[in-house]
A protein has these predicted regions:
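Short glycine-/aliphatic-rich beta-strand segments at the starts of folded cytosolic domains
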Residues: 1-9, 38, 74-77
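Conserved short beta-strand edge segments in small beta-sheet-based binding/regulatory domains
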Residues: 5, 27-33, 54-75
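Short amphipathic alpha-helix segments
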Residues: 8-29, 52
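Generic non-transmembrane alpha-helical segments
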Residues: 16-24, 55, 59, 95, ...
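Helix-enriched interaction subdomains in cytosolic or periplasmic regions
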Residues: 24-55
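A short, flexible N-terminal coil/short beta segment enriched in small residues
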Residues: 61-100
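Long, charge-rich C-terminal accessory regions
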Residues: 92-95, 99-261
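C-terminal, charge/polar-rich interaction regions
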Residues: 246-310
Length: 310
C-alpha cells in the first residue's frame, strides 16, 4: 500500500531524493519550487517510509503528513454571488490545500432562495467527478433542514455540510460542521481556525472511509503509477494549465481535451497492458479535460472474461 507524504526543504541535492523514491518503487506526484525552497509530494510503499525519513533528515528537510494528497475536492456554494460567496468558502478551499488536496470552488446556477434553490443533473454529474464535496450553506437552520438538503440528496460522492446554525445531523451527508455561516471577513481568529481544522478532519474521515471501501476490491493499478506514464505524453508536457494531471482516489483528471489525447492515453503501456484495457476514459464535464477511471481487480477480471468468451 502506498503512503503519500510531502517533502519540504531546499533544492540542494534534491535529485538524490527523486532517485531514492524511484529505487524503492515510489512516485513523485507533484513538485512546487520557489527559488531555493521546494515541496515535493511523493507516493511511497508504507514499509519504506524509514528510508525516506533518513534521507529527508540528511537533506535538512522535513516530511509533512498530507492525508488528503491524491484527492480533488469540490467546495460548493449555492451561488457565486456575494450573498452566498463569503470568505469562508475560499478559506475552506485554501485550508484543505494545506492537507494536500486539490480544491475547486463552484456555485450552483440557481441556488438563490430557499424554495427556488435547485441543482441540475449536469451540476450533479460535475460534482460527482470529484472525490468529495463540501456544501457551504447559510445561517438559517429551517432553510437548510427543510429546503437546502435537496441540493445534495442524490449526490453519490461523500458530502460534508458546513453551516452556521447548530445542526446535529443531516440526511445524505457524512458530517455537519456547524458555526461557520456567512461572514464578511476572513477566518483568522483562533476559534475560526479551529472550525477550518474541524472541516478538514471531517473531510479526512470521509476520504479514509472511501479509501477503505476501495481497498476491499483494490484498483488494478495505482493512480500514481498511471500518472507517471501520462506525464510523459507530449500534449501533457505542453499543457500550460496548473497541475495538468490531478490524482483521484480511483483515477486521474488529465487537463487535455479528450479528442486530442484519447488515443494516446489508451495506447499507454502499463506493465505490459494498454491503459485502455485497465480503465474507462471519457471526456470530463470540466471543459478541456479528460477523466480516467481505473477498474478494480474484479471489474478487470469481468471485462477480461467477457472479451475471452466473445
Amino acid at each position: 500500500m502506498y503512503e503519500v507524504l510531502m517533502f519540504d526543504g531546499g533544492v540542494y541535492r534534491i535529485n538524490e531524493l527523486y532517485e531514492l523514491v524511484e529505487d524503492i518503487g515510489g512516485f513523485v506526484i507533484q513538485k512546487t519550487q520557489l527559488q531555493v525552497a521546494i515541496t515535493v509530494t511523493i507516493a511511497i510503499p508504507s514499509e519504506d517510509r524509514p528510508i525516506i525519513e533518513s534521507k529527508t533528515k540528511e537533506l535538512g528537510g522535513k516530511l509533512v503528513e498530507v492525508p488528503l494528497a491524491g484527492t480533488e475536492i469540490a467546495v460548493v456554494a449555492p451561488t457565486l454571488g456575494r450573498h452566498h460567496m463569503p470568505h469562508p468558502v475560499c478559506d475552506i478551499a485554501e485550508h484543505l490545500r494545506r492537507y494536500g488536496a486539490i480544491t475547486v470552488v463552484m456555485g450552483l446556477a440557481r441556488g438563490k432562495g430557499r424554495e427556488t434553490a435547485q441543482i441540475t443533473a449536469d451540476e450533479m454529474a460535475f460534482i460527482e467527478e470529484y472525490d468529495a464535496a463540501i456544501f457551504v450553506l447559510g445561517n438559517f437552520a429551517d432553510c437548510i433542514m427543510k429546503e437546502k438538503v435537496r441540493l445534495f440528496e442524490d449526490i453519490e460522492v461523500p458530502v460534508i455540510v458546513v453551516c452556521g446554525p447548530n445542526i446535529s445531523s443531516l440526511p445524505n451527508c457524512e458530517a455537519v460542521v456547524c458555526g461557520v455561516g456567512r461572514k464578511a471577513e476572513r477566518m483568522r481568529h483562533a476559534d475560526e481556525i479551529a472550525k477550518l481544522e474541524e472541516t478538514a478532519l471531517a473531510v479526512e474521515a470521509a476520504i479514509f472511509k472511501r479509501r477503505n471501501i476501495i481497498d476491499e476490491d483494490p484498483l488494478c493499478v495505482h493512480p500514481a503509477e498511471v500518472k507517471q506514464r501520462v506525464d510523459e505524453l507530449e500534449s501533457v508536457r505542453q499543457s500550460l494549465r496548473p497541475s495538468p494531471v490531478v490524482l483521484h482516489l480511483d483515477g486521474l483528471r488529465v487537463k487535455v481535451p479528450y479528442d486530442q489525447c484519447k488515443d494516446m492515453l489508451r495506447d499507454i503501456d502499463i506493465f505490459g497492458r494498454k491503459l485502455g484495457d485497465l480503465t474507462t476514459i471519457a471526456p470530463s464535464r470540466l471543459g478541456g479535460s479528460t477523466m480516467i477511471r481505473i477498474l478494480t481487480t474484479a471489474q478487470l477480471q469481468t471485462r477480461d472474461n467477457a472479451q475471452s468468451s466473445s
